[in-house]
């Protein structure tokens, strides 16, 4: 039996979220039906707030809600070491480890010829503009084909400038996703990084 129209619309909206299939979307929709009006209003307000208040940091590309558009990490941390990641959620994974004291740079993607994503389609230019005074760039893209290609491309651009370029190391199997790695694995990968 098909879903009634309002439920079908809500399920269709939930399936637009990354990693949410129809069954999970239906569970979310049915869960909302069980909630009180005030709980649903709270959810609506939280969704509105996140869209209106959260922006990209103008320095690193991470999410921020600061009025000056600069995240707390960029304001307060050691700027001589930059850890380059694919997307903002990778920063959260590294921050759980609590061992990295430098700053980050979010590429907002990786080089992927199959998906027609080249170096100009991700924020490599923003990274290059931040290199004054930097001693090391740690490339922490996922250990898959696209992540490796991106790491090598970045290394070729930065190494001639006399800046040390390293890659997160063992502990992350090839093809894995940083966001899902546990804290110990990420800590080891950071600590045992290798020079490119």
Regions found by a protein language model. Name each.
Residues 46-91:
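Cys/His-rich short segments
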Residues 18, 37, 50, 62, ...:
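Conserved phosphate/pyrophosphate-binding and hydrolysis machinery centered on Walker-type P-loop NTPases
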Residues 25, 75-141:
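Extended interfacial segments that mediate partner engagement and assembly in macromolecular machines
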Residues 1-18:
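Extended, structured, electrostatic nucleic-acid-contact surfaces
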Residues 101, 128-196:
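Long C-terminal interaction/binding lobes of large macromolecular proteins
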Residues 7-12, 35-58:
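Short Cys/His-rich Zn2+-coordinating modules
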């Amino acid at each position: 039996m098909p879903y009634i129209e309002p439920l079908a619309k809500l399920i269709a909206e939930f399936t637009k979220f990354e990693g949410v299939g129809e069954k999970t979307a239906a569970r979310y929709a049915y869960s909302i039906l069980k909630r009180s009006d005030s709980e649903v209003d709270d959810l609506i307000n939280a969704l509105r707030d996140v869209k209106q208040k959260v922006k990209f940091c103008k320095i690193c590309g991470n999410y921020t809600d600061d009025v000056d558009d600069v995240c707390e990490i960029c304001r307060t941390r050691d700027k001589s070491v930059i850890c380059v990641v694919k997307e903002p959620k990778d920063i959260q994974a590294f921050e759980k480890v609590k061992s990295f004291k430098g700053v980050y740079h979010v590429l907002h993607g990786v080089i992927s010829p199959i998906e027609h994503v080249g170096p100009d389609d991700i924020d490599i230019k923003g990274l290059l503009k931040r290199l004054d005074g930097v001693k090391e760039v740690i490339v922490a893209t996922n250990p898959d084909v696209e992540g490796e290609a991106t790491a090598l491309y970045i290394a070729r651009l930065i190494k001639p400038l006399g800046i040390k370029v390293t890659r997160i190391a063992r502990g992350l199997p090839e093809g894995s996703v940083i966001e899902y790695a546990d804290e110990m694995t990420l800590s080891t990968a950071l600590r045992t990084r290798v020079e490119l």
